[in-house]
């Protein structure tokens, strides 16, 4: 290996997903307005443990803009935004080859992201944990789910997103 090869290696950009957490983004047609009680109930159902303060490894941290869910060894951040994900939906959807995906993306007005903050968790396991929580909060407002790290979008109008989450849960 020559000097130029070493130099290229030092200054080469990391792959996009090297530092990106595993994430599931629910694209919503209308705001969720999630309450602490709703998030605790969803986490309790997802992980089979009461979120009532009785177990220090299972709790919900609450702030109006950022919520966290501690599920045993896992830490999940839950971020809500009352704006389209990645900017103007029509502009983002222009590159879609599938018309149904394009229409679903354009429909969304707001989003909720579930990010696993534990970087050392294997990808399949990370998505399993996230899918358990996201599946409990999925409802008719959801236009689809997006996995940024995988650049994968699944629509919900035909139940595909729900089925995708179910498969990820294992």
Where do the protein language model's features map onto the residues?
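N-terminal alpha-helical "arm" segments
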Residues: 2-43
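N-terminal low-complexity, intrinsically disordered segments
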Residues: 32-102
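Short acidic, S/G/P-rich loop/turn micro-motifs used as interaction or catalytic elements
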Residues: 32-34, 118-122
């Amino acid at each position: 290996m020559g000097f130029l090869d070493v130099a290229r290696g030092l200054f080469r950009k990391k792959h996009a997903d090297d530092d990106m957490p595993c994430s599931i983004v629910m694209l919503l047609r209308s705001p969720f307005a999630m309450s602490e009680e709703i998030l605790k109930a969803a986490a309790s159902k997802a992980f089979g443990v009461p979120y009532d303060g009785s177990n220090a490894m299972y709790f919900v941290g609450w702030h109006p803009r950022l919520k966290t869910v501690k599920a045993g060894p896992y830490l999940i951040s839950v971020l809500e935004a009352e704006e389209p994900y990645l900017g103007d939906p029509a502009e983002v959807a222009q590159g879609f080859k599938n018309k149904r995906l394009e229409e679903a993306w354009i429909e969304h007005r707001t989003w909720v992201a579930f990010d696993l903050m534990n970087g050392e968790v294997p990808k399949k396991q990370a998505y399993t944990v996230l899918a358990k929580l996201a599946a409990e909060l999925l409802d008719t407002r959801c236009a689809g789910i997006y996995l940024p790290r995988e650049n994968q979008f699944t629509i919900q109008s035909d139940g595909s997103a729900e089925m995708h989450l179910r498969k990820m849960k294992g």
